[in-house]
Amino acid sequence: MDFFKKEILDWSIYLFLHYITRLCSNSSNSSTSHIIQEYNLVRKYEKVDKTIVDFLSRWPNLFHILEYGENILHIYFIDAANTNIMIFFLDRVLNINKNRGSFIHNLGLSSINIKEYVYQLVNNDHLDNSIRLMLENGRRTRHFLSYILDTVNIYISILINHRFYIDAEDSYGCTLLHRCIYNYKKSESESYNELIKILLNNGSDVDKKDTYGNTPFILLCKHDIDNAELFEICLENANIDSVDFNGYTPLHYVSCRNKYDFVKLLISKGANVNARNRFGTTPFYCGIIHGISLIKLYLESDTELEIDNEHIVRHLIIFDAVESLDYLLSRGVIDINYRTIYNETSIYDAVSYNAYNTLVYLLNRNGDFETITTSGCTCISEAVANNNKIIMDILLSKRPSLKIMIPSMIAITKHKQHNADLLKMCIKYTACMTDYDTLIDVQSLHQYKWYILKCFDEIDIMKRCYIKNKTVFQLVFCIKDINTLMRYGRHPSFVKCNILDVYGSCVRNIIASIRYRQRLISLLSKKLDAGDKWSCFPNEIKYKILENFNDNELTTYLKIL
């Protein structure tokens, strides 16, 4: 019959199955009485079979029967975007205006007395009055959602027996099987399990992808559905290495969920243990964060695992999985002593990801954390950037040297937004150190000329921070604002302290040389302003051009002019 052509069924199944499933999932969220919203008049029908009215009244949230009397039926539909689907459903599928028997009668639905179901439910002597009231108000709540689902299962069984196309897709590419798994709730698991088994046993495609690349089997693995029977039924016909839009396979998801039995079953069926998602993560990486049992399962598999040492260690650090890290180290699977192309180490990663337990473990195994990345960051500066005082305390307890403290505080103060309290902790720790003589010589001091002072306004406060040598205090700050640096050169605190040692004198000379250079550039620019072309340049460009000359060249040009 033409009626059973796929083109027709695609439309009817969209309403009949998907909408019913969506209604069931939404019904549990209903906490107020049913309020009739603005419905669109679909049709006015005459000579309507009472069975039709009973059938349509099962879904008051889909369409509202405004009037039924003298064989006249006014049907309103709330979803304006799909009004045409409703008209098609009522005219062509239910055959309301046809003299021959209705579609419901043809399918055998008349043998299922829905009114009797409702009557028994409402008039049950043991029924809670609140539930009866909800039914009378047209509500649908989780109290009787199982009843609705049971009824839906009956309808779907009849539809399948009449060769309905059960894998029709909605606008998101979802079939009814997708919908059932998406909306799966443990509280109604029995009804959902029955419906899913009906669909699976009748050949619903477990590999059909929705618009997000999810197959029903992937969804079953992704969601918290611990039903071994459903899993095994799906597995019989599923592509075990299918991927979603992020490249995750079913084995990725069951490993993430720590479902040991499902992981074991997939591996035994030949699932690819080295499949990588778009982030480069394999199922093994997803499973190792949960403990030793899954790790052993993967290591004992017949397939050789592809191990990216840096990636896997960082993955363990991100999840602070110390137990798994220790086990893999004891098995010789990983090595924590790596350095990236950015000179980042495992300890630096632990600080960056605030993995306290992993950091303690790594420091106890290998206490060397005095490394500087290619961007100038250190473990200490990273702890300040993360506002993590606990990690800062443990790092300072390991007694870092001045050699790493100065670059750390330079990196900290490069950022306008930093935790001042954590910076003061660094200053207190550094100021009383005496080994700065072995670190800085006068000749190399010029490299610090842009890092002399940051917290100019905090000098007086810092005097109370147990500072023994003012020059050390001066060197641990950085500054990009030349005007602030010039202000500091005239500050009374500097004038008093810069004569303490040769370093203070050198800092003073640096400031003097900067001032001298500024004067040279200013004078030369004024001399050149007499020329027509030079005067057309903006002052910022003039300054950048003249900055390329050294002091001797500037002096020579001034003499020539």
Swiss-Prot record:
UniProt keyword annotations, A-Z: ANK repeat, Repeat
ANK repeats (start-end): 68-98, 172-208, 212-242, 246-275, 279-307, 342-371, 375-404
Gene3D superfamilies in alphabetical order: Ankyrin repeat-containing domain (1.25.40.20)
Entries under InterPro entries matching the protein: Ankyrin_rpt, Ankyrin_rpt-contain_sf, PRANC_domain
Family: Belongs to the orthopoxvirus OPG189 protein family.
Bilayer-crossing regions: none
Listed name of the protein: Ankyrin repeat protein OPG189
Domain of life of the organism encoding this protein: Viruses
Species: Monkeypox virus
UniProt function note: Contributes to viral release without involving rearrangement of host actin.
Pfam families in alphabetical order: Ank_2 (PF12796), PRANC (PF09372)
